[in-house]
From Swiss-Prot:
Family membership: Belongs to the NusG family.
Keyword Cell division: no
PANTHER family for this protein: RHO-INTERACTING TRANSCRIPTION TERMINATION FACTOR NUSG, TRANSCRIPTION TERMINATION_ANTITERMINATION PROTEIN NUSG
Keywords of the record: Transcription, Transcription antitermination, Transcription regulation, Transcription termination
Entries under Gene3D superfamilies matching the protein: 2.30.30.30, NusG, N-terminal domain (3.30.70.940)
GO cellular component: cytosol
SUPFAM superfamilies: N-utilization substance G protein NusG, N-terminal domain, Translation proteins SH3-like domain
Any one GO BP annotation for this protein: DNA-templated transcription termination
Domain of life: Bacteria
Protein name in UniProt: Transcription termination/antitermination protein NusG
Stored SMART domains: NGN
Length: 182
């Protein structure tokens, strides 16, 4: 599987059971204090509201969908991996195959399903672009490159941009929030 460097993805993080809220708070504080807001974006505890009827009274409870897990939206770099991995209460990333190895991201369909169940939405970005328009890539390995939009995949929030590399036009896949229309 070819993982695009610099792409924003969702990862599952394993925590001590019952520490999900603490991990979320700790991680959000660490992101701010360590200036990681450009690499670590959202921390979500998968939970859903449940109504229980007890003694004839309806009571709403918030139940954790996946106890012991927190979802983190980030760009996987050595720094972001280190910050999350070393947050108090975190035992590790789900999907990493051993010491020091980087984890696999969650599939976009899985994330959409979980967020939809919670009543949240994946960030939607309204970009009015057409094939052939000029854009500037703002982040990632091709930051500050100017290119021409070749293909738009609205359902995946991605587009293919032709950039000039070493005198040749090269297609580069980027996310909507990584570009700026010229």
């Amino acid at each position: 599987m070819s993982e695009e460097v610099g792409a924003k993805r969702w990862y599952a993080v394993h925590t001590y059971s019952g520490y999900e809220n603490k991990v979320k708070k700790n991680l959000e504080k660490r992101v701010e204090s360590m200036n990681m807001t450009e690499q670590i974006f959202r921390v979500v505890i998968p939970e859903e509201e449940e109504t229980q009827v007890k003694d004839g009274k309806a009571k709403k409870l918030v139940k954790k969908t996946f106890p012991g897990y927190v979802l983190v939206e980030l760009i996987m770099t050595d720094e972001s991996w280190y910050v999350v991995r070393n947050t108090p209460g975190v035992t590790g990333f789900v999907g990493s195959a051993g010491a020091g190895s980087k984890p696999n991201p969650l599939l976009p369909e899985e994330v959409r399903f979980i967020l939809k169940q919670m009543g949240l939405k994946e960030k939607t970005i309204d970009v009015e672009l057409d094939v052939g328009e000029q854009v500037r890539i703002q982040s990632g390995p091709f930051a500050n490159q100017i290119g021409e939009v070749q293909e738009i995949e609205a359902d995946k929030f991605k587009l293919t941009v032709l950039v000039d590399m070493f005198g040749r036009e090269t297609p580069v896949e980027v996310e909507f929030d990584q570009i700026e229309k010229l």
